Amino acid sequence: MAKAKFERTKPHVNIGTIGHVDHGKTTLTAAISKVLYDQYPDLNEQRDFASIDSAPEERQRGITINISHVEYQTEKRHYAHVDAPGHADYIKNMITGAAQMDGAILVVAATDGPMAQTREHVLLARQVGVPYLLVALNKSDMVDDEELLDLVEMEVRELLSSQGFDGDEAPVVRVSGLKALEGDPVWVKSVQDLMAAVDESVPDPVRDRDKPFLMPIEDVFTITGRGTVVTGRAERGTLAINSEVEIVGIRPIQKTTVTGIEMFHKQLDEAWAGENCGLLLRGLKRDDVERGQVVVKPGSITPHTDFEANVYILSKDEGGRHNPFYSNYRPQFYFRTTDVTGVITLPEGTEMVMPGDNTEMTVALIQPIAMEEGLGFAIREGGRTVGSGRVTSIIK
């Protein structure tokens, strides 16, 4: 009976609940866990639902985030579900990437319709690259008028479309988290329908091994008689011995061939995403490469200096700055393994940014970094983290 738990054959998908505070995200999360436990008791653990709301603190890049993780399974998939209870926690979580979501359930109370935070969360989901949203119209048991429900649904679909999601096709499921928790069969079925929609509509994530190879360089050294070795943790993709690679960032792009791959002093034929390894590079001297560059599949990523970003600035209590900053502020931007100085330009109409704020900004780095949309970074001042952000678009 218990064997099903250890099946590693199912796709693993990370999802989350997003939406306005008090629209019932946490109650719905609890309802999903309970309904799936009752439906597939051999696949799911029973949980105490108070434990979802008392979210443990997590630290990501020096930022404290209250966030709770729940695991559950349907017949098709294994899910890790993240619920960030507070609005500020949700924003920090999205920007630091503390929980990368493959898809999200936008929770909208049928009694209220989309509110200011609903909009903000959808916008942020688009900016940080959440690939898929569907909608749980929660508290639907409290609305008797079918036409009113249709109206709210239309409004939510328009909101999704306005932010670049598929508002026409996204499933909108009418649910009641509270009634499902209480065991009301009509509403239990609504939560089952919601999870069936998640199974069907959130695409299987492309796992990191299927993407083009990328390894940030952490260290460079020379092995006498063999050449230059760079070490680091492969971020994505796979790399076979004798492959051509490019070294990108900080300096002009260099091409070379990987003539050896080592892990813990053992020779390997291939390096895989997630592994710490050393790569022996043909024809390069120790001074040709440095920490902060990346080893990549040729043509898969390009170096850039100017970009737009969405940034969270730490509050004083979180160990951040004590005072605001203005345009032309010059901190360090920590990408993957290195700091690069950059100059900040604030958007028109924003005169200054206070500690604890979430803001858009344009950044010009003094050296190019291998960059793509969605890449996370920390903002540092004298080695301590004062903010965290994501690249939303590349300028040059």
Swiss-Prot record:
Q: Which organism is it from?
A: Paenarthrobacter aurescens (strain TC1)
Q: Family per UniProt?
A: Belongs to the TRAFAC class translation factor GTPase superfamily. Classic translation factor GTPase family. EF-Tu/EF-1A subfamily.
Q: What does this protein do?
A: GTP hydrolase that promotes the GTP-dependent binding of aminoacyl-tRNA to the A-site of ribosomes during protein biosynthesis.
Entry binding sites for GTP: 19-26, 83-87, 138-141
Report the top EC class in one word.
hydrolase
The subcellular location is:
Cytoplasm
Listed EC numbers: 3.6.5.3
Pfam families from the UniProt entry: GTP_EFTU, GTP_EFTU_D2, GTP_EFTU_D3
Q: Where is it mainly found? A: cytoplasm
Starting at the broadest rank, the lineage of the source organism is: Bacteria, Bacillati, Actinomycetota, Actinomycetes, Micrococcales
Name of the featured protein: Elongation factor Tu
- tr-type G domain location: 10-206
Molecular function as annotated in GO: GTP binding; GTPase activity; translation elongation factor activity
Region G1: which residues?
19-26
Q: Which keywords does the record carry?
A: Cytoplasm, Elongation factor, GTP-binding, Hydrolase, Magnesium, Metal-binding, Nucleotide-binding, Protein biosynthesis
Subunit relationships: Monomer.
Q: Give the residues the record marks as binding Mg(2+).
A: T26
